[in-house]
Amino acid sequence: LDDRFAKAYEYSDCWVQDSRLVVLNARDAQARGAKIMTRTKVTSARRDGDEWVITTEDTNTQDEQEFRAKMIVNAGGPWVMDVIQGVAGINSSENVRLVRGSHIVTKRLYDHDKCYFFQGEDGRIIFSIPYEQDYTLIGTTDADHASFDERPVCTDEERDYLLAFANNYFKQTLSSDDVIWTYSGVRPLYNDGASSATAATRDYVLRVNDEGGAPILNVFGGKITTYRRLAESALEKIGAYFPNLPEKWTAGVTLPGGDFDVAGVGDLRVRIKSKYPFLSEK
């Protein structure tokens, strides 16, 4: 950091590999009886009395299957409105605001393993995180994203914004030549009519539509940090239609591979190193 910054405060947080988290949740669900269908999309859903008739398509073979269900949970993320309107053919006054978050990756800018949060003149904050051993991850932005069909890409404007933001704090002056790669994602935030993408709520909103028969639960918003609480809230909504659901249980249950004492991570690392000596220290 620049020498003019002499004071800071420190707190602890968590990080997660998002794709691995999704896979582990799918494995856990499968072990508990769920059927996981990858590379499959829902092409239509229609009400038939107190049931849904759902048509799916295998994206590799184009084979179609038909299923019946008492209820649909629409956790489509950025595509939640496409499921509501395009797949289920339902009109909805609720909507999501698609907000793009872009990141830049540079070579490692400092030796320690701490993260930084920086505050800018516009009132926003960005982070700087040691990333994949050899790099530093800097982000993120808040930019309205036009459509879920449009691939999210870090724009030159977003890249320059993050560089200027970081240059207010680091000794080293970064330029576009220092950016090794960029990536972007889209947040499906509940559209609360906020004046800017930054001001849009990060809370999730759950809405059940049962007009005309079988219910559908639509999930607007949500994030990794609170995904299990969101799921519990969703089950409370579902419980109005299925009163014999079990009590909440996920708070004290690990995902596959996590069933060991946190205090024993060091010993686990030693055992793995001994069993698989070809693995890199990293």
Predicted segment positions?
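Rossmann-like flavin
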Residues: L1-G33
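General small-molecule cofactor/ligand-binding pocket signal
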Residues: K35-M37, I180
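Core beta-strand elements of the Rossmann-like FAD/NAD(P) dinucleotide-binding domain
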Residues: N60-M71, A75
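Short beta-strand segments that buttress and anchor functional surface loops
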Residues: E10-Y11, I54-D58
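Short acidic, glycine-rich loop/turn motifs
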Residues: T56-Q62, R108, G120
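C-terminal catalytic lobe of FAD-dependent flavoproteins
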Residues: D18-L21, D28, V87-I138, A143-K282
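A conserved short coil-to-beta-strand element within the FAD-binding core of flavoproteins
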Residues: T38-V53
